[in-house]
């Protein structure tokens, strides 16, 4: 009996691990691409009832197979994620209307929020701010429109295959202001080691590509050589 109960407990743990919790606020895009139009959201699984500019959303957010454009409101506005919560973009484009200079982030003094880009998502804000941890999977990209400090009090983790671009930060500006905020698979970014930095947007910007570390490339080379020798036999 004890063995049977232990087995059931183990299966329950694995089931919880394999079945991630659903986001409580879900994008429907029923009316428009405006994230501040509440008719575009399904709040039925949440205690939250609105998404307003510069007001913390105290729940996880899921935007799947969608297209969002932050409207060009007065001043710089943002989709503001509540402390400790996550916004996930799944096969989604998240950007700005023409001429927009808005972004997303946490509240001032935030203890940390997460933005995850998966399944070919494109994240194109002017900036992120206030303790954002942005994670970009191997199929997704992020392009920041702003200059100055578009990655403000925030960090970015790249995966091999992901792309990070800045429209108004030259390679020199990126290196001086943002290199220390970037990791590749959790390891600090080092130019020529695990990232390459190239000019972008006619030279006024920069594009960062994650590359295999030299040790990984050597191992892949040895593996390819071993496979070729085996085939010759």
What spans do the regions from the language model cover?
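Short N-terminal leader segment in a subset of presequences, especially plant chloroplast
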Residues: 9-12, 33
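C-terminal membrane-anchoring or membrane-association module
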Residues: 228-233
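Short, threonine-centered small-residue motifs that mark membrane-proximal processing/anchoring sites
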Residues: 12-15, 19-25, 204-222
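Bacterial N-terminal signal peptides that target proteins for export
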Residues: 1-9
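Conserved Rossmann-like nucleotide-cofactor binding loop
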Residues: 225
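Beta-strand-rich extracellular passenger or scaffold domains
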Residues: 24-29, 35-210
């Amino acid at each position: 009996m004890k063995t049977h109960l232990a087995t059931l407990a183990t299966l329950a743990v694995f089931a919880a691990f394999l079945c991630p919790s659903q986001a409580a606020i879900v994008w429907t895009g029923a009316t428009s691409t405006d994230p501040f139009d509440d008719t575009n959201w399904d709040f039925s699984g949440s205690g939250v009832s609105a998404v307003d500019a510069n007001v913390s959303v105290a729940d996880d957010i899921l935007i799947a197979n969608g297209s969002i454009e932050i409207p060009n409101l007065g001043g710089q506005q943002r989709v503001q994620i509540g402390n400790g919560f996550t916004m996930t973009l799944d096969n989604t484009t998240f950007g700005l209307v023409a001429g927009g200079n808005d972004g997303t982030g946490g509240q001032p003094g935030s203890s940390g929020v997460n933005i995850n880009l998966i399944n070919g998502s494109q994240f194109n804000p002017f900036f992120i701010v206030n303790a954002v941890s942005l994670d970009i999977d191997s199929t997704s990209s992020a392009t920041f429109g702003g200059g100055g400090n578009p990655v403000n009090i925030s960090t970015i983790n790249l995966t091999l295959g992901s792309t990070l671009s800045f429209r108004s930060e030259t390679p020199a500006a990126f290196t001086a202001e943002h290199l220390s905020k970037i990791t590749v698979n959790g390891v600090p970014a080092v130019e020529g080691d695990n990232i390459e930095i190239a000019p972008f947007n006619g030279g006024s910007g920069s594009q960062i590509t994650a590359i295999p570390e030299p040790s990984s490339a050597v191992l892949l080379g040895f593996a390819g050589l071993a496979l070729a020798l085996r085939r010759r036999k």
